[in-house]
Amino acid sequence: MPGQKIRIKLKAYDHEVLDESAKKIVEVAKSTNAKISGPIPLPTERALYVVLRSPHKHKDSREQFEKRVHKRLIDIIEPSPKTIDALMKINLPAGVDVEIKL
């Protein structure tokens, strides 16, 4: 498929699982002789939630919760049909969100 590019965006709360998944995708794509750019680490989304510890008073006592979303980007340049078939068969761990653009 000349001139075509597949962009894969991965998101997860756990960066270790995310890096493992990115490594699997890169290995599969390289085994089918596709050109690869990445995995490129994108900025981590960080959300902070502050909650009162008690139900109705003691405003000075608060608890903080944080949610981080780690992201990686992988570009597969000029993929073959063999590459696409191999990517469809990959079994990734739960907790990894995969977004694919052609």
UniProtKB/Swiss-Prot annotation:
InterPro entries: Ribosomal_uS10, Ribosomal_uS10_CS, Ribosomal_uS10_dom, Ribosomal_uS10_dom_sf
SUPFAM superfamilies assigned: Ribosomal protein S10
Gene Ontology process terms (BP): translation
Superkingdom of the source species: Bacteria
PROSITE patterns reported for this sequence: RIBOSOMAL_S10
GO cellular component annotations of the record: ribonucleoprotein complex; ribosome
Annotated Pfam families: Ribosomal_S10
Keyword Nucleotide-binding attached: no
UniProt GO molecular function: structural constituent of ribosome; tRNA binding
NCBIfam families, sorted: PRK00596.1, rpsJ_bact
Family: Belongs to the universal ribosomal protein uS10 family.
Assembly mode: Part of the 30S ribosomal subunit.
Role played: Involved in the binding of tRNA to the ribosomes.
The protein, known as: Small ribosomal subunit protein uS10
